Regions:
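An N-terminal amphipathic alpha-helical segment
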Residues: 2-39
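Intrinsic-disorder/low-complexity, polar/charged segments enriched in Ser/Thr/Lys/Arg/Asp/Glu/Gln
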Residues: 11-13, 42-46, 76-78
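Hydrophobic small-molecule pocket/channel-lining residues, especially in calycin-type beta-barrels
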Residues: 22, 58, 72
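General detector of folded, globular domains
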Residues: 33-36, 55, 69
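An acidic-aromatic pocket/loop used at catalytic or ligand-binding sites
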Residues: 39, 44, 86-87
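Short, structured protein-protein interaction patches enriched in aromatics and acidic/basic residues
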Residues: 43-66
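C-terminal edge-of-domain segments
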Residues: 64-88
Length: 88
């Protein structure tokens, strides 16, 4: 488990690297969906991808997930997703 930022008081993050799946021509969305659906309230998902997953970001934001994106020196991207805290 990893954290997107040392000062962020966020859940622990499960890492899922989709680069090999994509390189093999496999659509990673079904596996991402399984992992997102299995998240506990105190967990988040960190996805490592070869490109910025803009459609996924928009989709999960529409499901009340917060997002943080970090470009990596090797050209890959780490995108963190976690459930937004309930209002109030």
């Amino acid at each position: 488990m990893i954290s997107p930022h040392p000062t962020m008081s966020l859940p622990s993050f499960k890492r899922f690297d989709v680069r090999k799946l994509i390189a093999q021509g496999i659509e990673p969305l079904p596996e991402i969906r399984k992992r997102v659906d299995a998240l506990k309230p105190d967990e988040g998902l960190a996805i490592v991808s070869p490109f910025l997953p803009s459609p996924l970001i928009e989709k999960l934001r529409g499901e009340d997930f917060e997002t943080r994106v970090e470009p990596q020196p090797d050209g890959s991207w780490v995108t963190y997703f976690w459930r937004a805290a309930p209002a109030g």
